Amino acid sequence: MNIKNHIKQMLLGAGLLLAVLPSEAQNIIRPKIAGPNGLWVNSYNGVLFFGQTDMETQNSQMPMQLRFYYNSSAQSTNYGYGLGFSLGYEMRYRINEIGGVVIETGDGRSDTYKKFGKEFEAPAGVFSKVEEYESGKYRLTEKSGEQYFFDDAKYGKVTAMTDRNGNKTIFTYQDSLLVRVQDAVGHTINLSYTDGLLRKATASFHKGSISYEYDGLRRLKKRTDALGNSTLYSYDKQNRLCEITDANGHKTLIAYNNSGMVSRMKTDVSDKSIRYEGDKTVFIDYTAPQ
């Protein structure tokens, strides 16, 4: 389904872009509104999310990266990286009240596989397969061939993954927190925690370490890379991310309406407004064209 087919009206001129997106077409694919500096907004529910890569291999046949995601609807959830933040590797599963398997990915997506006998049925629009390959152990197979293994019912988290060529990556936990990632060619990521919060990340392929600091409400407030460059994070009274300041002092501001939906994203060079009007979402870009 092409997102362009959902755009009913678009006006471009004098630095103003207005798009009207109908929400009734959101059953499987929900158009995302692009914001500044890698921010995105779900046009259906107004949730803010973005990804942040802190480490990654270069020119490797087996890529590995340390990547975090923020989701404003999870502002009360702490996975060990500050409220609202999750780690890309942190896939989780649980069994629901009727025996189905619910799998949540690191970016916050949640899919429920309904149980029918010994089989599990994927939700509409999802082409992955879930199976209980041993008692209490589950395997998720993607259409592309990647497989994810959930062998520890205590924590309900992914314990290993294989790519379509059979190369295996192993995840090690301590007290439910991911402390080590190791792939088949020897790349490793090591994570250190204090009081249940990530404080330092190191990797075999990355020079130096990255440090993380939090406020008294367990919200990520500062990230500092190996060169001493820091990114700062601020929040509103509802624990939603409302300001990001990069190492050069440039700010990205995020505002929310009374329903907790993103209503504005602003930087020194861009200004984007979003209104939610019944069955449609109105997106206005005030940024002057270059």
Where are these regions (language model features)?
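Intrinsically disordered, low-complexity segments enriched in small residues
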Residues: 1-83, 89-91, 95-102, 108-110
